[in-house]
Amino acid sequence: MQTFLVIIFMMVIGALIGGVTNVIAVKMLFHPFKTYYIFKKRVPFTPGLIPNRRKEIADKIGQVVEEHLLTEEVIQAKLNAPTSRDAIEEIIFKQIAKLKENHTTIQSLADIVDIDFSKTANQKLDELISDKMDNFYLDYQNTPIQQLIPNDIESSIDDKVALLPELLFDRARVYLKSEKGGADIASMLDTFFNEKGKIVGMLQMFMTKESIAERIQHELIRLTSHPKAKAIATQIIENEYATMKSKQLNELINETQYQAFKTSVTELALRYVDLEQTSHKPLHTIMPRFISFLETKVSKTLTDVIIDNASKHLSPIMKKINLRQMVEEQINTFDLAYIEKLIIDIANKELKLIMFLGFLLGGIIGLFQGVIAIFV
C-alpha cells in the first residue's frame, strides 16, 4: 500500500510540475506586458516574448502578407476571376438600373457637392459660346465673306440668287394686278396731282385720273415681263451679291453689330437648352436611350475597363500603399491585451492541449520516478 501511495504521489507531483510549467510558459508568451527591474537590474523574461518581440513579429507578419498572401499575382488572378468580373458587372448594372427607378436629377447629383448646376452650366455655356465666337471673329474679321462660306452652301445660295429676279417680278406682277395694287397706284397718283396742280390741269384736258391710273398700271404690269427690265434687275442683283461676298467680315458686321449678334446668339442658345428645367427632370426621362445603352453595352465594357486599368496600375498602387509597412503599423497600434485575446481565440485548443500535455508528461515522468525510487 505504501508503495502504491508513493507512486501516486510522485505522479501527482510530476503532473503538477509539468502542467504548471507549461501554463507558466504559455502565460509568459504574453506576460508581463512591461519590463520589471530589481535594484536597477532587469528581471529576466520581462517583458513577455510577444511584447518583447512585438516589432519583429509585426514586421514578419507584414512581410508574409506582402510576399506570400496579398501579392500582385494573387490580386490580379482574383480580379480576373469570373466571380469577381460578375460581381463588378452586377454592381455597375444595379447602379445603372437605379437611374431608371428613382427620380435622380442632374441638380440632385450636383447638390451632393453643393453646386447650382443650372447657374454654373449656363455661365459655362455662355462663356464657351462667347469664346468660340470671339475667336472666330478675331481670326476671320479681315477675311472675305466668300472664303468663309462652304462651297456647297455657296453653290446653293448662288442658285437661289439666280432665281431672285424672276421671283421679284412674279411677286410684283401679282401685286400690280391685285385690287390693292390698283388702289395704291390711284392713291399715289392723287398725291402727285395735288402737288403738281398745273400739270394736272393740262393732263385732265385729255384723260381722267382713272384712265391715267389704269394706263400706268398696265404699263407697269407689262414692264414686269419685259426682257430688258429683267436683264437690268438681274445685273443689279448679281453685282450687289458679288460685292457683298467680296466684303470682309468686319465690313459686313462691325464691332458693335457683332457684340449685339453674339448676345442674341448666346441668349437664344440658353433659352433653347433651358438648363433650369432640364436639370430638374429625372435622368431617365432626359436620356432614355442613353440609359438603355449603358445597360446593354457600357456595363460590360466598363467592367473590362475597370479590371484592365486596375491590373495595369496594380504594381504602382501596391508600392504606394506599402502593404508591409501598413500591416506592421496596424499591428503595432493594437493593445497587447487585444493581441493576447486574438492569439488565444485563434490557438485556444492548441494552447489548452499544450498545457494538458504538460500535466500528462509530468504525470508519466512522475510514474517512472516513483517506480525507480522503489526498486532502486
Swiss-Prot record:
- Which Pfam families does this entry report, sorted A to Z? DUF445 (PF04286)
Instruction: Enumerate the transmembrane spans.
Output: 4-24, 356-376
Cite a GO CC annotation.
plasma membrane
Topology within the bilayer: Multi-pass membrane protein
The yes or no answer to whether the keyword Cell membrane is present is: yes
Instruction: Please give the chief subcellular localization of this protein.
Output: membrane
Where on the tree of life does the source sit, at the highest rank?
Bacteria
Q: Which residues form the signal peptide?
A: none
Subcellular location(s): the record lists: Cell membrane
- Any idea which UniProt keywords this protein has? Cell membrane, Membrane, Transmembrane, Transmembrane helix
**InterPro entries recorded:** DUF445 (IPR007383), UCP032178 (IPR016991)
Q: What's this protein's family per the entry?
A: Belongs to the UPF0754 family.
Query: What is this protein's name?
Result: UPF0754 membrane protein SSP0953
Q: Tell me the organism.
A: Staphylococcus saprophyticus subsp. saprophyticus (strain ATCC 15305 / DSM 20229 / NCIMB 8711 / NCTC 7292 / S-41)
